[in-house]
Amino acid sequence: MEGERDMSRTKVHVIPHTHWDREWYFTTSRSKVYLVKHVKEVLDALENGDGFKYYLLDAQGSLLDDYTRWCPEDEERIRRLVSDKRLMIGPWYTQTDQLVISGESMVRNLYYGMETAQKYGHAMKVGYVPDAFGQSAQMPQIYQEFGIRHFLFWRGVADNTNPKTEFLWKGSDGSQVFAVQMPFGYYYGGNIPEEAGELEAYLDSQIGALEEKASTRHVYFPNGFDQAPIRLNLPELIRTFNELDPEREYVMNEPERFLEEIEKDSNDLPVLEGELMEAKHMRIHKSIFSTRADLKQQNNEIEHLIVNTLEPVLSISHALGHEYPHYIVKDIWKLLFENAAHDSIGGCNSDTTNRDVAFRYKQARDIAENVLELHKRLIASKIKQEETFAFTIFNTLPYPRKGVTEIDAYLPEGSFVIRDTNGQQLLYTITEKVEQTDYVLGQHIDLNPSKKVYLPERVFRAKLLVELQEVPAMGYTQIIFDFSATGDTTAERSNGKHIENEFYSIAVQENGALSITDKISGRVYSDQMVFEENGDDGDSYNYSPPERDLTVSSLGTDVETITSKSTVSEELSLRMKLKVPYDLNERSAAGTSAELPLQASVSLRKGERLIRFSVDVDNRVLSHRLRVLFDTGIASKLSIADQPFGVIARPTTLEEVKVWEREQWTEKPITIEAMQSYVALNDGSRGVAVMTEGVREYEVIGHEHDTIALTLFRTFGYMGKENLLYRPGRASGEKIVETPDAQLLGELTFTFALHVHESGFDEAGIAQAAKEYLTPLSSYQLSDFLNGRLIFAFRDEERIFEQNYSLLSFSKDSNVILSAFKKAEHSDGYIVRVFNPYLEKNATAHITYSESAHYELVSLDERSKGETLVSSDTEGAQLPELQHCKLLTVLVTPELN
């Protein structure tokens, strides 16, 4: 009977922990200085033998890297405690966001986080997410790929969806993990009173609330808070808990052991599917996706640079005999991880902290661009050719590509033609040309004075658009600039209002918007590219409209137009000035004393089905939001957008809007959503997609929910504010922290694209079009007159590489999307990661490596799944068929000669 009573008692698992924001309203420097004090106290407490058994260091491996960099003498102490599973770290490197950073960034964060934790002795196999603002629908699959079966979190689930704390979470692909919610947050047990009378009432209240939500006898009671010191007398307090409350059992524990216990006692759990984004009981800040648009844009650009260009080029370079710079790439990623932490990428920081974020982006970009340039140069310098003006063109997608691409070049004065390696003349136009003779030639160094080097009399830095015929899959080709022949590069400029290519005809309407005609179907889309400006009374966490708003539309605004037309592209430039309120006070009075100058460039490239947009804004006003609207004419109940490693359909209206105020939700449920690169509306026979290089935020608006609103930017003046229309009650963050930098005053530039199609979504190839849009062909100019201090001098190399090269390719009928191609972390092979981008149909691919190779399925942590596709073959390997939102990773290992 005694045993039965024990088994019926509530078992309270007291989890000592910290939630350590590496930066927020304070800087990383302050955080790291105080981290040293904190970790020393934790190590001492765990070692003193007074019942302090476990401590959770926020599941962030970066914290120990930070600590041991300054306290290397404690590394062995840490290894001992981590190996004994008493100091719990991992699986993350930093506590990352899951909605606005890329899928690859999340995967690398987990990979390097677990690698770091294992370096110290043990990586916690729990998806521990105490504070991220919502949970991506693809995380169950990602967790399972890393061998993580348990998920412990706070934000995103409300009692109207699941009244209990335990459930099974099913991801978009069908993967499941066992989930436990901390219903009242990670800080719930952070303030324990020590006076006996107060403590007894406290336990009855706090633990009683947890019991009401628990579906087993186990409850999770976290003792910790933001950057709070360890509660040194916690073992003594737990002994007191047991004395004061004999009806319950109190034990100190850590997440892994807790989850193993509670899972054994769990039966018939409900299954929750998809994103966890409910804000009834806790805030998820669902419009933080556009906070500090300037920083979000930098993050996106660098993620694309690393994954879409840098890692593939480094892999090509490695296959050609050059060393793969693993540690440089890791350092770039770790800079991004610091910025991927939920507050950092959220932008909900002080201005000082956000300047640190911006500097890390600068560092990451500088390193990435320079290591990319070095390896393109290593390859180009060994290609068999003797031309003065040879350009190597790199294709980092697994199929041949052609079309118009932009190239940067240093050119002498004079006319020229461009030819490919077959001697075929290529069409081109020069779009920009600036003389830099003194700068370039003044840096030249003659390493070999005996060698005759052509030095032009004048040098111009130029941008060109060149129509390439074919660039090999995952490889390179060359094009030659021939100055002995004459080419016509002129573009005709006029005050016209119309441009076109094979697919579209675009004209400026009388009201200043665009009329787009799809030449294939003859369908006309009127009132496109409408700019909408309105007030933002929110803060760094949430967009919120003012109580008295004024919305300004570009419709009816005077527009000046210029067209530029060449053989390879046509461009339409529009200038306008919106009359807008200067600030929220003027907006509430419906005043419009300020101007918001806009310049929009709309371009069509020969043979391309994309309409490209670039918008320059001179932001002179405060606390507002600017969006660009595309009226699709497709009444939609669902929007379609990409998510990490797949696609997701979301409702365009929410029933919860009717009850949120009555039920006192912490935030208004809204349909402002996140994407990775595109959003689309489709009625089964036609569709429209908007692709972005910048802010990954959209909303579907209009009476028929037929208009895609792409957020360009939003601005605000305080880190936190109280009593917002969309977020009533207390301020998030700190309301006294002013953020004038977040007003984003000055010049801003945004780029995005439009894709119109007469087909269902799956048939339109939107994911591939977006991937190509975000993966431009890359070029390198090898010219002796550039060899010098300008780019660091290079010696002459033996020319042994062919002018055309392909390392790896997918067959023509392959329909997966390449997510990553890189050197494996700890083997001689290459990682190929793909996913199914479709709503309904399955996807597959046939991969062929350039040599005989071994093809093996591996998990996201690059461990073998025990399934070899092909052991040794020159014909490649057929991948298994992938269902909706499934990802697949293949290790391709070349045979040693």
Language-model-derived ranges and their functions:
Residues G3-R108, T116-Q118, E145-R149, L168, ...:
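N-terminal catalytic cores of secreted or lumenal carbohydrate-active enzymes
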